[in-house]
Each structure stands twice: as C-alpha cells, then as structure tokens.
Amino acid sequence: CGGCEAGSAGKDAFHLRVRVHPFHVLRINKMLSCAGADRLQTGMRGAFGKPQGVCARVAIGQVLLSVRCKDGNANHAQEALRRAKFKFPRRQKIIVSRKWGFTKFSRTDYLKYKSENRIVPDGVNAKLLGCHGRLAARQPGRAFLEAVGN
C-alpha cells in the first residue's frame, strides 16, 4: 500500500493510518509423536504453550487501514488500497469517507467552520470552537455562536 502510493503520488501526498495492531499472542503446546513419548510429556496438564506468533483480533466490518490525501490523489490512494487488500484474508471493501481527513466533520461542515474561523488544528484532528468558555478570550463579535448541530 505504501510503496504503490508513494511511487505514484509522492511520499508527502498521503497519510496512512493502520487502525489494527497484532497484540494477540498465539501459543502452541507441542506434543511428541515418537515412541516412548507418553513417559516424557504430561498431556494437557500445564498446557499453556510457547509463543508461536501474533495476530490482530478483528471484528466484522472493522476498519483496518485509513488513508487521507488531497482530492487529486484520491485515485492513486484507491488503487493502492485495492492492491493492499489482497494481502489480507477474507473479502475487504474500500469505502470513500464523506468526512474531512481523519476528523469527525463532513466536508461541507469543515469548510464552513474553517471560513468562520471556528476550527482549531489539533494534530491530525481538528477542534471545533463552541460557545463555552471565558467571554474575554473570544474574538470581537464572536461572543455568542449559534448551536452546533452534529
């Protein structure tokens, strides 16, 4: 996903977020299958097992990867995700979000709030300034805002 995306759109043209991580440890209780093995092992007594690998526990419909990019690079991002989904088991879907980047605001709301100077950048997210807090800290003419309908 990253190599295809970086090759066509450039390395600074997208932001990839991996939403699931492999924290679940898979273990194996090795059993001997040779002659005299019954004298060496204890069966299921103390069968905790040794770590064999790790995996991610994923629910049906859970988001695995998220990519944000500019509208001009959207086709490159979709192609990269299409190639990447073959590396995952089962059937995967590519869904184009109606939100702005990784924020919780829709595109139209984000652009409206940005033109009103009500959006404050907060890392990869954005905060919406509401009508709470000290009046002295507000901009002139911005003391009382209409309620936000999310």
Swiss-Prot record:
Gene3D superfamilies listed in its UniProt record: 3.30.60.300, Ribosomal protein L10e/L16
InterPro entries: Ribosomal_uL16, Ribosomal_uL16_CS_euk_arc, Ribosomal_uL16_dom, Ribosomal_uL16_euk_arch, Ribosomal_uL16_sf
This protein's record includes keyword Phosphoprotein: no
Alphabetized PROSITE patterns for the sequence: RIBOSOMAL_L10E (PS01257)
Keywords on record: Ribonucleoprotein, Ribosomal protein
Cross-referenced SUPFAM superfamilies: Ribosomal protein L16p/L10e (SSF54686)
One Pfam entry name: Ribosomal_L16
GO MF terms held by the record: structural constituent of ribosome
Cysteine pairings via disulfide bonds: none
GO cellular component: cytosolic large ribosomal subunit
Keyword field contains Ribonucleoprotein: yes
Biological processes per GO annotation: translation
Assembly and binders: Component of the small ribosomal subunit. Mature ribosomes consist of a small (40S) and a large (60S) subunit. The 40S subunit contains about 33 different proteins and 1 molecule of RNA (18S). The 60S subunit contains about 49 different proteins and 3 molecules of RNA (25S, 5.8S and 5S).
Family: Belongs to the universal ribosomal protein uL16 family.
Official protein name in the record: Large ribosomal subunit protein uL16
Organism: Nicotiana tabacum
